[in-house]
Amino acid sequence: MLSDGRSGGLAMLWKEGAKVRFKSCSNTHIDVVVCEGNGAKPWRATRFYGHPDAGMRPISWNLLESLHRQCQMPWVVFGDFNEILSSDEKLGWLDRDARQLEGFKECLSNCGLFDLGFVDQRFTWCNGRIGEQRTLVRLDRMVANKEWLNLFLEVKVVHRSMVAFDHCLLSLSLRMRESRKVARKRFMFEKM
């Protein structure tokens, strides 16, 4: 998806040979179905961008709930949600309004989505300032439904370093449950 002003736009990348079927897109999401082959159950992946304006964020949550209603299959959603789930996901500057957090939590609950956790860096975004105005926040995350989690023996989300961007790279490592010969798959998503 094309950028809007200084924002980088959305991208979803996968390795050559992966069977990925496009479902839908907008300036705030890209939705695909991933078919691993070898009889593995297809699953859905959605790249998501939550509206940066807190007052407009309910529109983002409505979109996510609409996507949920369109297709009931194993589902993972990842990206910059522009929201946190708890106050410990933000360090510095002004506190978030508790109603904002509740709207995000309610949306994830309505969609049956669970945070996948992470290893490495605690925060995924930095405002680039120093001193008292420096703010670090976990805006980027991966969430999935139970059906998607049941497809894999192991799911690992890593927050990679913020080298060239104000957001960090999210890396997802999966170990399939279905195959006889256990193979490691590695997906990497980067905010563009």
Show the residue positions of the predicted features.
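A shared catalytic/ligand-binding motif for oxyanion handling
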Residues: 1-192
